[in-house]
Amino acid sequence: MMKGNKILYILGTGIFVGSSCLFSSLFVAAEEQVYSESEVSTVLSKLEKEAISEAAAEQYTVVDRKEDAWGMKHLKLEKQTEGVTVDSDNVIIHLDRNGAVTSVTGNPVDQVVKIQSVDAIGEEGVKKIIASDNPETKDLVFLAIDKRVNNEGQLFYKVRVTSSPTGDPVSLVYKVNATDGTIMEKQDLTEHVGSEVTLKNSFQVAFNVPVEKSNTGIALHGTDNTGVYHAVVDGKNNYSIIQAPSLVALNQNAVDAYTHGKFVKTYYEDHFQRHSIDDRGMPILSVVDEQHPDAYDNAFWDGKAMRYGETSTPTGKTYASSLDVVGHEMTHGVTEHTAGLEYLGQSGALNESYSDLMGYIISGASNPEIGADTQSVDRKTGIRNLQTPSKHGQPETMAQYDDRARYKGTPYYDQGGVHYNSGIINRIGYTIIQNLGIEKAQTIFYSSLVNYLTPKAQFSDARDAMLAAAKVQYGDEAASVVSAAFNSAGIGAKEDIQVNQPSESVLVNE
């Protein structure tokens, strides 16, 4: 049995909890239930069925606030003690245009957390520990080092680390005990899948991109008309900016990565007014012909750039040539800067699925076979199929769910089935797209991701999040379509979802 966190609803002058409400019965009592931002702890301490103590509620503080295109306000709360973030799920309070609370997503912790340990290693110490755990990677880049405390009061460091351009591809998340330096958890995220000129990708589709022109030729870097910097570097040539004497002489893999990266950035800008991956104008950086240490036939997001390996099939194309794969990788970046879905278990499968669904939509939603554009003599299919996940050995319903699925040909478990179990949500998302159309579906997906989901979200939370987004933006009919799609996969009105027992199944494709 698995129990996801719930959406907490306000009904009349009271607040009740449920995980199956279709929102059609949701009644917002604006006059009775209006809270200011300074009263967020009051909301959490007065929930009718899931109320937490006032002392526990007072440890929550607002760390982010957004207003969406429909006038809904979303306050993201984080639990803190003595200025240190508690490693529990975020909570998001959703308010209508009048300031009335409509729902609360996440999983409030009814516990007053107190620090019961000391920090004996510090940031420099944790860097040494992680470096010693990666002896073959000489140039690690620490993207984030955050001190946190768990519910038991143990201090630890959560560290996001990648490699420098000259190092082997690495993308890792560590949790290191701040008292004795032991590695509590390690997640490997590596294996996922000036002026403007017109460049054509591998399929002769033209794109306008910024470049630098000089007397010696053309270089693939520059700033676009929104102020975002774009660049592609060569993984086989000391990670230098890709350049050539003329347009026709440019590395085609680099052109694919560059044009597709610009296209995906523009998609998010045009449809959701998102200013680059982090919504703050971060550079769009790509590495092509990545070596690991030899030809690396894969692609991944490392926290600051997209990395595309050099294909091991001479007659084939790299993953940079597939617009849906580029959209997939860049959406991992969007997720990292919004919901922050942890790359483990169901939250990790959601992370993968949102990337697949958005990549599919960005590429025109014409082929449900993700990565089909990279097919070659040796790579005859894509990597996943949204319409029929079973084609690649993925489950399509919760009856086939397995959190112990492994990568094909390896003894390593798939981070709790992040790639394997994404097939369930992929099929649900594909059904929603077919029944509501691209425009409505993409808005529901994006809004649920950036406004409702929290880092430890489960499949049932994605259902509630999409229901909320559909209801707010398109009404009861759209919400019914979303509900039916989830019901068809066994993610329905029940608070607990029955799943099969884990087995030694194998993930067919990476």
Curated annotation (Swiss-Prot):
Entries under Pfam families matching the protein: FTP, Peptidase_M4, Peptidase_M4_C
The UniProt record lists the keyword Coiled coil: no
Entry GO terms, CC: extracellular region
Record's subcellular location: Secreted
Activity regulation details: Inhibited by L-leucine hydroxamate and phosphoramidon. Not inhibited by phenylmethanesulfonyl fluoride. Reversibly inactivated by straight-chain aliphatic alcohols.
pH-dependence of activity, as noted: Optimum pH is 7.2. Active from pH 6.0-8.0, activity decreases rapidly at more acidic pH values. Stable only above pH 5.6.
Catalyzed reactions: Preferential cleavage: Xaa-|-Leu, Xaa-|-Phe, Xaa-|-Tyr, Xaa-|-Ala
Catalytic center residues: 329, 419
Gene3D superfamilies with a match to the protein in the record: 3.10.170.10, 3.10.450.490, Neutral Protease Domain 2 (1.10.390.10)
Residues annotated for Ca(2+) binding in this entry: 324, 376
Function: Metalloprotease capable of the hydrolysis of insoluble hydrophobic substrates. Hydrolyzes azocoll and gelatin and, at a lower rate, soluble and insoluble collagens. Does not cleave short synthetic peptides. Preferentially hydrolyzes the 24-Phe-|-Phe-25 bond in the insulin B-chain, followed by the 5-His-|-Leu-6 bond. Inactivates endothelin-1, primarily by cleavage of the 5-Ser-|-Leu-6 and 16-His-|-Leu-17 bonds. Hydrolyzes the alpha chain of C3 to generate a C3b-like protein. Inhibits complement-mediated hemolysis and opsinization of bacteria.
Name of the molecule in the record: Gelatinase
Protein's organism: Enterococcus faecalis (strain ATCC 700802 / V583)
Originating gene: gelE
